UniProtKB/Swiss-Prot annotation:
Annotated protein name in UniProt: Ribonuclease PH
SUPFAM superfamilies: Ribonuclease PH domain 2-like, Ribosomal protein S5 domain 2-like
Top-level taxon in the UniProt lineage: Bacteria
Family: Belongs to the RNase PH family.
Statement: the UniProt record of this protein carries the keyword Transferase: yes
Recorded catalytic activity of this chain's protein: tRNA(n+1) + phosphate = tRNA(n) + a ribonucleoside 5'-diphosphate
Taxonomic path: Bacteria, Pseudomonadati, Pseudomonadota, Gammaproteobacteria, Moraxellales
Binding site for phosphate: R86, G124, T125, R126
Organism, as annotated: Acinetobacter baylyi (strain ATCC 33305 / BD413 / ADP1)
Any one GO molecular function term: tRNA binding
Length: 238
C-alpha cells in the first residue's frame, strides 16, 4: 500500500469542474488528489505572425505556480523578471500536447491560449494541467462553433497525461509529491484517446531502469490515461 492507501496502479481522486470562472471561453478546475490547477482557454481572432495568411489557427499554453502553491512561498516569476527553465519546458509540453488534439486548419485564423495556473501542488502538476486544459480547449472551440467563427469542429480526439514511477522496484501510477521525490525513476506520459503517444519524459534518479520496467510503466500509464479520458468525457457530458 502507498502513503494514501491507494493501490499501486490507482489514480488519486480526480475531479474536473467546468465553467469554473466567469469570463474565459473555457475554464476548468482540475484536481488530482491535493494537486489543483486552474486551466482557462482564451480566444484571439488572429494568429501569430509566422502563420499569417496560411488559413490555419494556433493553440499555445502558459504555465505558472501561485507563490504559496507549495509548502513554502516562492517569488512570482514576474517579480524575478524571467521564467525558469522548468516553466518554459512545461508550457511547451502543454502546448504540444494540446495541438495534437486539434486540426489547426479547421480552427481557422484563430489562436486559443490556455493558461494553466497551479493553485496547489502535490506532484503531477504538468499532467493535471494537460488533462484539464484539454477540456477547457474543447469548451473554447465549441464557443467558436456556436458563434459561427468556424464551420467545422477542429477536435481530433481527447488527450490526457499521467505520471508513473518506480519506487522500491514497484511501478506506481499518479505520483504524489513525496512519491515523486523518493522514486528511483519517474515518467510523464501524454497520450491520445486513440492510444497513441504524444510525449514520454523519463528520468532515472537512483539507478537506470530496464526495457522491461519501461514497458511496465507505459502499460500502467496507458491504463491510467484511459481512465482519465473517461473522466474527461463524463465532465463534458459525452
Amino acid at each position: 500500500m502507498r502513503l494514501d492507501q491507494r493501490a499501486l496502479d490507482q489514480l488519486r481522486d480526480v475531479k474536473i469542474t467546468r465553467n469554473y470562472t466567469r469570463y474565459a471561453e473555457g475554464s476548468v478546475l482540475v484536481e488530482f488528489g491535493h494537486t489543483k490547477v486552474l486551466c482557462t482557454a482564451s480566444i484571439d481572432n488572429s494568429v501569430p505572425r509566422f502563420l499569417k495568411g496560411q488559413g490555419q489557427g494556433w493553440v499555445t499554453a502558459e504555465y505558472g505556480m501561485l507563490p504559496r502553491s507549495t509548502h513554502t512561498r516562492s517569488d512570482r516569476e514576474a517579480a524575478r523578471g524571467k521564467q525558469t527553465g522548468r516553466t518554459q519546458e512545461i508550457q511547451r509540453l502543454i502546448g504540444r500536447s494540446l495541438r495534437a488534439m486539434v486540426d489547426l486548419k479547421k480552427l481557422g485564423e484563430n489562436t486559443i491560449t490556455i493558461d494553466c495556473d497551479v493553485i496547489q501542488a502535490d506532484g503531477g502538476t504538468r499532467t493535471a494541467a494537460i488533462t484539464g486544459a484539454a477540456v477547457a480547449l474543447i469548451d473554447a472551440m465549441n464557443v467558436l462553433l456556436e458563434k459561427k467563427k468556424i464551420k467545422q469542429d477542429p477536435l481530433k480526439g481527447l488527450v490526457a497525461a499521467i505520471s508513473v514511477g518506480i519506487y522500491q522496484d514497484e511501478v506506481l501510477l499518479d505520483l504524489c509529491y513525496e512519491e515523486d521525490s523518493n522514486c528511483q525513476t519517474d515518467l510523464n506520459v501524454v497520450m491520445t484517446q486513440a492510444g497513441e503517444f504524444i510525449e514520454i519524459q523519463g528520468t532515472a534518479e537512483e539507478k537506470p531502469f530496464t526495457r522491461t520496467q519501461a514497458n511496465a510503466m507505459l502499460e500502467v500509464a496507458e491504463k491510467g490515461i484511459q481512465e482519465l479520458i473517461k473522466k474527461q468525457q463524463q465532465a463534458l457530458g459525452w
